[in-house]
Amino acid sequence: LNICAAVECIHSYSLIHDDLPCMDNDLMRRGKPSTHIKFGEASAVLAGSSLLTLAFEIIVDQKYLLNSKVKNEIIRSLAICSGHTGIAEGQELDLKFENKQKKINQIIDMQKKKTGKLFNFCLYAVGSVANRTEKEKKFLSNLGEDIGLLFQLADDFLDNKGSRKLLGKPVKKDNKKG
């Protein structure tokens, strides 16, 4: 359960930061004002950053009975998935590609990092807790990344074809940004 809570912290941090004016500048999230709209930009940055570190605090909590090897594997994987080669890099690519023509492989790379890496972590963590082999954990990681990519493709499709009422946010925003 602690790993699930940590994942939700990482997910929430990434959404709060993604909505910031310096990123996507989304005013709504799930039909409600984005964090920076409701509490201000500085508080949103601090909230997102706090959630990122809280995820690791939750995993290392002593009351959860993970052995040190598994705990270290999970911490390392979560850092990789959320950091400079994962979610953060995916966000950077999103900014870099804004209003530019993109090749399909660039879109896939960005989406695998921005969204797929968190799904990657979820399945890897299951393999770690279940003491699976490295080969099995690698398979689970790749499967998670592919599921994340499919999720993001579906989200992009809904952004293009859905309605504000259905999604709880303005639609066709991603299309306008290229």
Where are these regions (language model features)?
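Acidic catalytic motifs of isoprenoid enzymes
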Residues: 1-100
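Divalent-cation-assisted or electrostatically stabilized phosphate/pyrophosphate-binding catalytic cores
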Residues: 25-52, 99-118, 138-142, 162-178
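Active-site alpha-helical segments that house and flank conserved acidic catalytic motifs
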Residues: 1-23, 76-88, 116-127, 137-165
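Short helix-capping/hinge motifs at transmembrane helix termini and TM-loop junctions
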Residues: 131-132
